[in-house]
């Protein structure tokens, strides 16, 4: 690999002295709804405090990556609250050398080394995990229950987001729901424990820290909506006024580059908000450039009046941003266009149930004239797809879609394709008006923004039912079924387009003018009749004869009924009773342990690990695949 450019890394020399960083937060919340071994009740916490042995602070539960010490743990009415000290110069070096200097480009004075470290560790390890000893059936908690505290990306217990700062009071201050007695007790116990440490530092090794930090990133890289989850945990912990979770556009600090923005954000719904100069698109940050804009009822283009209504004021809608070479539409409307484009146009139907030919008239009373381009009257050629009304497969799909939509609405989730309902109350940084300040120190209870630029919102209490309803993996099967139903609808539309007679699968019929006394011709198609079957007209349907007179041209010889050539019988319809079982995937061998094991086998079985890692569920869409195979096989 090529060497990094001089400006890609921090240019200041790295000192040998560690910056003391205080960390504070809740180890658990009593009313969070944690289940199983993760649940901690007030009686258990009171029995475990104060701990007999000092509690170490490590990274991601790695025993060889100890970076600090827990100074104090107090029993708050909301849950156990701790204060710790991190003093590891090797951890600071690893973070500083791995970070690019472009992250901290900003207007105004540059950030100090302490501020850069706080931004890095707060964004990389925003959560904490308490490891407790596993209690047996008859065992009771004692002062050896707590084993250690680990810094991690996302903890399994709710409300375990921590704050980092270089001052003890500044680390505790953001927790607005912490009781005054707990705040004062934590401050007093932490100061006493820090004096006993007398400037101690920890040095687990650069290689061990690098391996552990990389493992943390790999184990959490597929975590869905990581920052939304951090936001929810942050609100549960009652954190407000903490600034070191701020970051912004292009992975730089807020205010890194001047951006020309309209007077009002384009998502506020103002008509003038979409009037953006053409040059502003090229200057916009990469994260904000998106070909599809979701809005709430704002007319983006007058090209599609059914989906994009013109404002009632009568003024023409402003031109969308860009040079005019592409169209900006909502994602839900785009999906409707794609699905509707493949649907065939309805053909005009006659009274007999088949399409009426253009420029032709039906047989009238005896002696009436005939059209020069009248096709043979063969009603049985046209399959049932030409008749109006949904097919049984369409009715099943429509019923399934309606049931899924009703279930989502009953569960409090927005229906698919509804851009007007948001799953969370957060706002993006470009939604804030010019009068809103991100650093308003006059409002101590305000919810300040954090990465990736969420504006403050109204404070909300802890809602365990909402957290349980939006837990990961709840509606993965329903989402997969919705995708399967959409694919079936599109495939059905393509099939209807291909099988629409007489333009799709039937060969063109020659113009024929029957003579008096001739039997009505019949034609067959190999794809529509079974083997050894010939369709003949019913005996009571005798055609009307044309008027007597010389023919304008020589009559075409009548068509002779032809039998369909015998073909292979159709495959039997699979059923649930005769369907072969799905192949069973072989079990994967356990992954090899790295150079830094989390703990020995005996210790791992005796501790309760409260950190979480991203889990890839390979069986998420298996139910949807079975549904698709059954629907396709029953057609």
Swiss-Prot record:
It is an enzyme of class 3 (hydrolase). Signal peptide: none annotated. Residues 409-419 have a biased composition (Low complexity). Keywords: Host cytoplasm, Host nucleus, Hydrolase, Phosphoprotein, Protease, Serine protease, Viral capsid assembly, Viral release from host cell. Region of interaction between pPR and pAP is called Amino conserved domain (ACD). The region of interaction with major capsid protein is called carboxyl conserved domain (CCD). Its EC number is 3.4.21.97. One of its GO terms (molecular function) is serine-type endopeptidase activity. It comes from Human herpesvirus 1 (strain 17) (HHV-1). Residues 324-343 are annotated as: Interaction with pAP. Gene3D superfamilies: Herpesvirus/Caudovirus protease domain. One of its GO terms (cellular component) is host cell nucleus. This is Capsid scaffolding protein. A motif (Nuclear localization signal) lies at residues 426-429. Disulfide bonds: none annotated. One of its GO terms (biological process) is proteolysis. SUPFAM superfamilies: Herpes virus serine proteinase, assemblin. Residues 536-574 have a biased composition (Pro residues). Residues 615-635 are annotated as: Interaction with major capsid protein. It comes from the Viruses. The keyword Phosphoprotein applies. The keyword Phosphoprotein applies. Residues 409-476, 514-606 are annotated as: Disordered. The record marks 247-248, 610-611 as: Cleavage. The lineage of its organism: Viruses, Duplodnaviria, Heunggongvirae, Peploviricota, Herviviricetes. The active site is at 61 (charge relay system), 129 (charge relay system), 148 (charge relay system).
